[in-house]
A protein has these predicted regions:
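Residue-level detection of the helix-turn-helix DNA-binding "recognition helix"
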Residues: 28-29, 53
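N-terminal targeting/docking segments
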Residues: 3-5, 9, 37, 58, ...
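Polyanion-binding surface elements
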Residues: 1-26
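A short, Lys/Arg-enriched interface patch at domain edges and termini
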Residues: 47-64
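Nucleotide phosphate-binding site architecture
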Residues: 24, 33, 49
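Short Lys/Arg-enriched helix C-cap and helix-to-coil transition segments
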Residues: 35-41
């Protein structure tokens, strides 16, 4: 198991192609797969992909 379970918020920003401040704003949302370990915010790596898919599905439903 070489894949990390969690990634940093800046890494999530890089993967999503958004700014770090935007990623930190997402991390404060209840539906985003981020949580605190001590004072550090981390993102559940597998959950990030699922979150992106759910956002894409939601956009399709809204525009239909």
């Amino acid at each position: 198991m070489n894949e990390k379970l969690t990634i940093s918020v800046p890494e999530a920003a890089r993967r999503l192609g958004i700014s770090k401040p935007s990623a930190y704003a997402l991390a404060r949302r209840a539906d985003f797969p981020a949580f605190h370990i001590g004072e550090r915010i981390v993102v559940y790596a597998a959950g990030l992909e699922e979150w992106v898919k759910s956002q894409a599905e939601h956009k399709k439903e809204v525009s239909a």
